[in-house]
Amino acid sequence: MNKQKIGFFIAAALATAAAAAAEPQAESAAAEPAELPLIVVTGSSIPTTPDAVAVPVETLTAAQLEASGVGSNALEILRKEIPAFQGRSNAGTSNANNNNQNTAGGSQVQLRNLPTLVLVNGRRVATSGIGAVNGKNFVDVNQIPAAAIDHVEVLTDGASSIYGSDAVGGVVNFILKSDYRGLATGARAASGADYGEWSAFATGGTPVGAGHITATLNYSHTDPLFQSDRSFSSPLYGKTSNLPGTVSGAADILSAGISSPSAKNPTGVNATAPSLAALVANGTYMPTTPARVAAGFDISPYQTMLLKQDLASFTSSFDLPIADRHRLTLFGDAMVSQDRSWTKWAPVAATGNTVPVDAPYNPLTTAFPGVTFSYLPNPHDFYDTVTATRITAGLRGEISHDWTWESALVYSESDLQQQQTNLIYKPNLALAIAGGFNAAGQPVAGGPFSDVHTGYSLNGPLALQPALDPFATAAGLVPGSLANLYGTEVINAVSQLESWDGKIVGRLGKLPAGEVGLALGATVRRELLSGHTDPNGRVTDPVTGAFGVNSQYWIGGTFADPFAAHRTISGAFVEVRVPLASEAWNIPVFRAFDLTAAERSEHYSDAGNSNVPKLGFRWQPFDQQLTLRGNYAKSFLAPNLYSEYGPTDTRQVGGAVIPNAFPGQGLPPEPFNGEDGNNPNLKPATSISRTIGFVLKPGFVRNLNLTADYSNIDLRGFQAGIGFNNILQSINTQGSASPYFANLAIGSFPGQAGASNPFGTPGTLLTYLKGGLANAANLYVIDRFQNNAELIEKSWTVGAFYSIATAHAGTFELGTTGSVFDSFTFLDLPLPGHTFIQYAGNATNAGVFGGTLPKWHFYTTLVWSSNDLHLEVANSYLSAVTDTGANGVSPPLPVSRYSAFDLRAAYDWGKLTMAMGVNNVTNRMPPLAPRTFSDNNADIATYSPIGRLLYATVTVKL
C-alpha cells in the first residue's frame, strides 16, 4: 500500500476540520466533565471507561443501523457501514445461483475476508444447519433482525485468547435491546426496478421491579431478482449446451421448426433411418457444436440473482434483580426465527441417455446413444426453511465491592429443511423412455405407454402412463408423459450448541499507577451437527454400502449419506490489565500507559489442545489528544465437524482433470475413481495477528476524531482440499517423495484389499496413463481436507469523524470509515510451482478466499440536523480492481471503480418519526468482471445489483 495515501487522508481530514473550526461556534456553558461509567467492550472482560479501551472496537448504534437505508438484513447493513466486511465469504441473498457458497438463504459475515466469530450478547450461536450437507460453516446473522439490535460491536483484532476458536479476523457482537420503555411499531417499504422489499416490527419493554424486560417482533420480505432483470447479466449466453433437442453431446440439434423426430420420421418398430447421419440428411437434425448451442441459449430468464426471502422473528431479553444482597440478578435472552427462502436454477438435464431400439420415439433402427433430455418449463427450485432457536439464562452478582461473578447457560439450534423440486427420478427415466406397453398395460414391442414406479421408490406400485419422448422439446412432449418423472428431494439438517460459561472479574490490587484488573473464566460447550437426504439422495447403498447402487437417484440433486457427529470443548482463560503510568503523575511521554495480557487454553475432544496468548498496550504520550494502541495475538480456527466426520463422496471424476494435470501430453479426457470428503485427523489452523494504531482527538479542532489501525495476520494450516490434479502432478514429479503418495493406488482405493501403488519412481504415472485408455479407469485417488493453506493479510482500518454545531444553521456531522488493503496473499499448497496468489486489488475465484478485494473501500456520510429534521448524503466508494479469472493468473481485465450516493431525510415529531430516502441515486450497476464471476458477469455481493431503490419508513411510539 502507498503509505503516502494514508498520510494524505489524515492531513486532508485535519485541514478540513481546521477550516471548519474557524466557523463561529454555538456558545455552550462550560461544565465539569462527568465521571465516565465503566463498560465492558467486546474483546475484553475487564471493565474500563469508554476513553480507555485498548482494543480496536467500532460500534454501530441502533440509530446508525436505521440511517443506513438498508432493510433488516444484518449482513447488508454491516457490509455497507463497515467496509472491512468484504470478500466472497460475506455471502447472503446474492447466493441465489452459487452452490459453492451454499448458505441455504442465510447470511455470513467475515471481517477482511477472514474467519470471524459471531456473538449475541457476548455469547456464541449455533452454526447453520446447512453445514451438515457440505454447505458453509457459519453463523446465520439473518436470524438477528435490525429492529431488535441495540448496537453492534465490531472488534477488528484476533481474540481467541478470550473467546476461543473462530476469532481470527475479529469478532462481531450483536447486543440486543434490553431496557426499552414503552411500545414502538414501525414499517419500511422499498421499491426499485423489478424489485421490492418491506418489513414491519413492534418493540415493547417494561420495568419489572428494579429490572426490565424487552421483546421485539419482526417480519421482513424481499423479492427475488432474476438475471434477466438486469442488463449486465442478460442476455447470458454460452453457459450450457445440455438442452432439449440435442444429441451426440450437442454435436447435433433438431432443425428449426421441428419439435421431435417423430414429427418427420417413423419411430419405434416402424423406424427406417439407419443412423443419425440419415436424420441429418433428411433435415431432422443439423450439425452443430456444443459451443454454438450454448451461444444460442439465454439462461438468464431461468435463474435468480437475488433470492426471495421471508423472515419472521421474535427476540426478548430480561434483567431481573432477585436479591439485594450481593446484587444477585437473573438475566437472559431468547431468539426464535423462521427464514423461508426460494431460489431458481436452470432446469435439470439428463445427458448421455441411450434410447433402446424399438422404443416408441426412437427414429433409428438401432439404439440411439447420446440423447439429452430436459424440460425447460420445469426449473430447478430450492425452497429453504431455517428455524433457529436460541435461549440464554444466567446469574450475576457481587462477591465483594471489588469482585463480581457471572455464569450462564446457552442452548442454540438451527434446523434446516431444503426441498429441491423438479429433479428427475433416475429409475423412472429409463422406464419412461423404453415404453413397450399398450393402453391396456399389456407388453407390446414399441408400445406408446410405460410402466413406472410411483412414490419415487423402487418399492412403489407400478403405474401406466404415456411413454416419454426424450428427443422432443417442450412443444413436442405428449401430455402425461412427465408424471412420476419429476420429483422433490427433501434434505434435513440440524446444528446444535449447548454451553456453560462462568467468570469472575475484579481488582487484583493497586499499583502506584492504578488498579490492576483481572478476569478469570471457564467454558464448556457441546456442538452437534447432523444431516441427511431422502433415500434417493444417498451416495451409497443403505444396506451394502456399494457406491451408486440403490442410491443417487435424483438427477440434479444433492448426494450425501446420513451424517451425525458431536464434540465437547472445554476451556479457560485469564486476562489482566496493568497500569504502568498514570496521568496524575504528569510524566512527559508517559502520561498514561497500560499493558494487557490474556491467555486461553482449550481442549477439543476431537482436535486436541490449543493455547493462545495475547499481549497489548494502550499509551497516551502527552494527554488525551493522542492514544496509541497495539496488540500481538495468537488465534486458532478449529476444523468443523463436517470436515472431520462428514460422509466421503466416492465418484467418477470428470475426464477433464487428467489432460489439465498433464497439459501438452496429448492425453484424452479420461475419468477415474475419486474419493473426497472428511479427514478425522485435521488440526486447528493457527494464526498470528499484529495490530498497531492510534486515536487522535486534537484539542485545536473540537469534535474531531481520527483513527487508524494497521493489521497483519498470518493464518497457517487452513483446511482445504488438495485437488485431484495437484495429487497427480505431485506424484508424477516426486514419486514416493510426494507428500500425497499415499493418496493414490491402482486396483482399489488406498488401504483397501487389492490396492497397490507402482508409481514410486518419478514419471511412471504419466507413462502409465499414456499406456492405454483403460488405465485411467484403474486409478483410485483420495482427495480429502488437509491443513495445507496459508494466508497473509496486511491492511489498514481508518476512520474520521467531525461535527460542528452552529448558532443558527444547525449541526453538521461528517464521518468516514475505510478499509485499505496493502496485501492479501494466499498459498493453497506447499508444492513446487505453487506460489502465493494476490487477492488485494483483484477479483478472482482462485483458492478458498476468492472474491473482490478492492484496495480502497470507504463509506462516507454527511448529516445536517436542525431541531427534529435530519438530512443525510452518503457515499460508498470502491477502488478499481483487476479481473484475474478463475485461476488467478488469466490475462487480466480492468474492473472500473465504483461510487454510489444515497440520500435520506427524516423528521421526528416525538411520537411519530418518518424517513424517506433513495439508495444509489444514480442507479450505478456493478462493474463487469466476467472472467471471475461467470455466473452473473459481475460480483453482485460486493456491488449491489438492485440499483436505485426508493424507500420510506415510519415509526410510532405509543
Which residues make up each language-model segment?
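Short strand-turn segments of transmembrane beta-barrel domains in outer membranes
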Residues: 153, 180-205, 297-307
